[in-house]
């Protein structure tokens, strides 16, 4: 999967912050993670967006102490899905798995310097994919 081409007119681009546009145009952590510990694929049945998230964690005998050491994503979706997945991927590297639930929608929106209300579905999709990947850790 690769990011989709977003065919929006210039006026619609004005509703997004420079931070958002940077993450959309140059997504961080895009691609495959060969040595992943867990993978999740989630689908938004309303808009059709699909997001695949793969994570690798440091080994530790206590699950709650493990830290995310790498994350990669692939997205088929709108610009918001791509930008959100990119910013979430930056937010979680180095964090303990137990602390990930502390990241909420507002944190993601703030990291993007704002997001139109009509695009919040992308934040929900991104957080859901991450939570599902974490749930698949053994």
Language-model segments: residues:
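Active-site- and interface-proximal helix/loop "cap" or "latch" segments in soluble metabolic
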Residues: 56-62, 66-124
């Amino acid at each position: 999967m690769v990011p989709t081409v977003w065919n929006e007119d210039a006026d619609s681009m004005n509703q997004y912050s420079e931070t958002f546009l940077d993450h959309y145009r140059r997504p961080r952590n895009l691609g495959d993670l060969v040595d992943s510990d867990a993978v999740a694929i989630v689908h938004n049945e309303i808009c059709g967006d699909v997001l695949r998230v793969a994570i690798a964690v440091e080994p530790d005998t206590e699950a709650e102490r493990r830290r995310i050491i790498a994350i990669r994503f692939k997205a088929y979706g709108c610009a918001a899905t791509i930008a959100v997945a990119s910013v979430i991927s930056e937010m979680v590297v180095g964090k303990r798995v137990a602390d990930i639930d502390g990241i909420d929608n507002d944190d993601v929106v703030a990291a993007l310097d704002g997001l139109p209300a009509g695009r919040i579905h992308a934040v929900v999709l991104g957080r859901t994919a991450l939570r599902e990947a974490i749930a698949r850790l053994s």
